[in-house]
């Protein structure tokens, strides 16, 4: 829309990390372009690209973090909370091991927000990421709560976030395990009401399994009897 020249390199069109080192790819692309956005799996890949490209490198998503989504989420919460971010509370409920929960934890800590993670302990963010976030929160005045109680996590929250329970590339067999672990962490009208905040708002980075209007959604309904998974 802004008139920039854009090239999309799909996985099959690049030999990055396979037949060509990440360092060499970074150096070549850095001579051809003014910026690079990487959307893939390895956090180490985007960090190595940034080290050697010589131009700005943007993390569009990795397994560990999703910072560009955080710009959108911070703006949305600021626009719809009616108060400064450092006076805003939000909860993330669900599988908290991956990029969305990690990024929301770091975002909230940096902005001095009241952050709650509601998940089974086996699905909490890594101790390293939690420790880093707590250290930042001590400087910004932020608050961090990790709990296995979904209702405790959402109490008093202005926003409730969640994400998919099974990510792209994971086998179908993962669904049964996640449903067993996370069935008490679905975002439902009852969980929203448990916030005690009549103005609480729901956020999801999408795509969301919230009904039967997709092939996967219909399969989940036929297999597990659920009309919607992480949110309904």
Swiss-Prot record:
Its EC number is 2.1.3.3. Carbamoyl phosphate binds at residues 15, 39, 66-69, 204-207, 232. The record marks 79 as: Important for structural integrity. Reversibly catalyzes the transfer of the carbamoyl group from carbamoyl phosphate (CP) to the N(epsilon) atom of ornithine (ORN) to produce L-citrulline. Pathway: Amino-acid biosynthesis; L-arginine biosynthesis; L-arginine from L-ornithine and carbamoyl phosphate: step 1/3. One of its GO terms (biological process) is citrulline biosynthetic process. It is an enzyme of class 2 (transferase). This is Ornithine carbamoyltransferase. Its main location: cytoplasm.
């Amino acid at each position: 829309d802004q008139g920039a020249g854009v090239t999309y390199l799909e996985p099959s069109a690049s030999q990055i990390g396979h037949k060509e080192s990440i360092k060499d790819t970074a150096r070549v692309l850095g001579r051809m372009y003014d910026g690079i956005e990487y959307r893939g799996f390895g956090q180490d890949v985007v960090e190595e690209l940034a080290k050697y490209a010589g131009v700005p490198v943007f993390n569009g998503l990795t397994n560990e973090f999703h910072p560009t989504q955080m710009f959108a989420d911070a703006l949305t919460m600021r626009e719809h909370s009616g108060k400064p971010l450092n006076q805003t509370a939000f909860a993330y409920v669900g599988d908290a091991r991956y990029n969305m929960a990690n990024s929301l934890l770091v975002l909230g800590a940096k902005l001095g927000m009241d952050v709650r993670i509601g998940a089974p302990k086996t699905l909490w963010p890594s101790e390293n990421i939690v420790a880093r976030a707590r250290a930042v929160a001590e400087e910004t005045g932020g608050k961090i709560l990790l709990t296995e109680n979904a209702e405790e996590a959402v109490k008093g929250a202005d926003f409730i976030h969640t994400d998919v329970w099974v990510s792209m590339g994971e086998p179908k067999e993962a669904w049964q395990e996640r449903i067993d672990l996370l069935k008490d962490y679905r975002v439902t009208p009852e969980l929203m009401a448990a916030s005690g905040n009549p103005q609480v708002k729901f956020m999801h980075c999408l795509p969301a399994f919230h009904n039967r209007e997709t092939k996967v959604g219909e399969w989940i309904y036929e297999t597990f009897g659920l009309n919607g998974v992480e949110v309904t």
